[in-house]
UniProtKB/Swiss-Prot annotation:
This is ATP synthase subunit alpha 2. Belongs to the ATPase alpha/beta chains family. The gene is atpA2. It comes from the Bacteria. Keywords: ATP synthesis, ATP-binding, Cell membrane, CF(1), Hydrogen ion transport, Ion transport, Membrane, Nucleotide-binding, Translocase, Transport. The record marks S341 as: Required for activity. GO terms for molecular function: ADP binding; ATP binding; proton-transporting ATP synthase activity, rotational mechanism. It catalyses: ATP + H2O + 4 H(+)(in) = ADP + phosphate + 5 H(+)(out).
Length: 513
């Protein structure tokens, strides 16, 4: 009887139990007062609980409540890009003076709790989503439509990896949704500032739920995923980042305790896995040719990957990038533990050239780790071990990549070849050499031609001519020592066969150091 009276039975913090001769439905919204709403999150034959959005001091036991038509259907307005919004689409902050939202919106409108598409609506992942980070794009390749967990202790660079990936999409058509779940205001400001400074605000929606609003924290990942589905179904690829699901899980635990739901390990409810699987399984690559790539972020304590939440999300996703505080303490950033990280799509999203060289880099890394204990000894090692140690040390230097300094696919491929060839004489000035090559290959006329050839030849089925590439890189590196040793700017540009613009850029960067 939908016309029956519904009243509040009890109030526990932000959870309200209601009763009445009414056919309660999960996810239904109720009006408690003029500015307080409730969301039906648990219903059975005996009890019904609402999650409250608003000040519970304004309501009391016995108050009659009214069911609403709303069931959290997300409508994605195109003016959301470049702004921070909440689950209702209200603008919380915008760099632009115009904070009004026009009526121009994506056609599709999905429910926040839409059931994930079946296998018949999905296709195999075969396109890369490049992060610009050497260690990930070479050793842990990610595909469009992949669900890739970012897991690690606080302050180990998880958010930085996500932001770097976002920045690397600047030149393509991928839309981005960054979901802030209970982040501190200072962290949120820093993220938004980075998005604006890196000129990706025009393609990014930043959604935020404050740490003191459990209602918004509970709902925001589901609402954000509905926005991602709206965009994807309109013919655009989407990257969605949940930062972080640890805060979301903590809200689920609080709700379970307040509603008397049975809890288990770490006091989490038994349906914790289901709560996150029904969210993350909505990502993927679909038959319309477009995708939703998902990066859930989870915090660990003391690098412990065996916690319930971490193991749950790892079993749902298609791989994990593990950051480690001990690696960070060694000064290596991003602090990715390659031994514990994995991408289950692997070479299926890499070109033949990248896949081939990635295998060689992986071998060098693993063999170096096996022989690392001999690296600082005076033992008489055989040539193969010495070669592995030399290449391994150089590889570790290259893995230490500056924040937001994205490497293109062709540059990553060239760096990987350099490591395998062993043409860096030693591990000194590795960063300077990379900067030199970066500017030459990006800005110099001859360098651009070389990169274009590498891009073309390293397509899905193409192969790079290693002999030609090696000869050209050796020629460029032969000039590095002379350029690095120049003490003044009164040098003969023509001596190095490089454009004046590039030579100035390279030399200025080296002088800065």
């Amino acid at each position: 009887m939908d016309n029956a009276k519904i009243v509040i039975k009890s109030i526990k913090d932000y959870i309200v139990e209601v009763q009445g001769d009414y056919d309660f439905r999960l996810y239904e919204v109720f009006q408690l007062t003029d500015d307080v709403k409730g969301f039906c999150l648990s219903v059975d034959e005996k009890r019904t609980f609402l999650l409250i959005d608003g000040d519970t001091s304004k309501i009391k036991v016995g108050t009659e409540i009214i069911p609403l038509e709303s069931r959290f259907i997300a409508k994605t307005y195109k003016d959301y890009f470049g702004k921070i919004i909440d689950i209702d689409g209200k603008v919380l902050y915008s760099e632009s003076e115009d904070q009004e939202i026009s009526e121009k919106a994506y056609e599709n409108e999905n429910s926040a709790f839409k059931v994930a598409s079946g296998i018949q609506d999905r296709v195999k992942l075969n396109e890369p989503l490049e992060t610009g980070i050497f260690s990930i794009d070479i050793l842990l390749p990610i595909g469009k439509g992949q669900r890739q967990l970012i897991l690690g202790d606080s302050k180990t660079g998880k958010t930085s990896i996500a932001l770097s990936t976002m920045i690397n999409q600047k030149e393509n058509d991928i839309k981005i949704i960054y979901v802030s779940i209970g982040l501190k205001s200072n962290d949120l400001k820093r993220i938004y500032k980075t998005i604006v400074e890196q000129k990706i605000a025009h393609k990014t929606i930043l959604m935020h739920a404050s740490s003191d609003n459990s209602f918004q924290q509970f709902l925001i990942p589901y609402v954000a995923m509905a926005h991602a589905e709206n965009i994807m179904q309109s013919g655009e690829d989407v990257l969605i980042i949940f930062d972080d699901l640890t805060n979301h899980a903590n809200v689920l635990r609080e709700i379970a305790l307040l509603t008397g739901k049975p809890v288990g390990k770490e006091a989490f409810p038994g349906d914790l896995f289901y709560s996150h699987s029904k969210l993350l399984e909505r990502a993927g690559k679909f038959k319309n040719g477009y995708s939703i790539t998902c990066f859930p972020i989870v915090r660990t304590i003391n690098n412990d990957m065996t916690s319930l939440l971490a193991s749950n999300i790892a079993s749902i996703t298609d791989g994990q990038i593990v950051t480690n505080s001990e690696i960070k303490d060694q000064g290596i950033l991003p602090a990715i533990d390659i031994g514990l990280s994995v991408s289950r799509t692997g070479s299926s999203v890499q070109s033949v050239s990248l896949s081939k060289i990635a295998i060689e880099i992986s071998k060098i890394y693993s063999k170096y780790k096996q022989n690392e204990k001999f690296s600082d000894t005076n033992f008489d090692l055989n040539d193969s071990v010495r070669d592995i140690i030399k290449k391994g040390k150089i590889l570790l230097k290259i893995l230490n990549q500056k924040e937001f300094q994205a490497y293109s696919r062709s540059f990553n491929l060239i760096i990987a070849y350099i490591v395998v060839w062993g043409i860096f004489e030693d591990e000194e000035k590795i960063y300077d050499k990379l900067i030199y090559l970066y500017f030459v290959l990006r800005y110099d006329y001859i360098g651009k031609i070389l990169v274009n050839v590498v891009d073309k030849k390293s397509g899905v089925d193409g192969m790079v001519d290693e002999g030609v590439l090696k000869a050209e890189i050796m020629r460029l590196l032969a000039h590095f020592k002379d350029i690095h040793n120049i003490k003044t700017k009164s040098y003969n540009d023509g001596k190095f066969n490089l454009s004046t613009r590039v030579l100035h850029k390279v030399k200025d960067r080296i002088w800065e150091k």
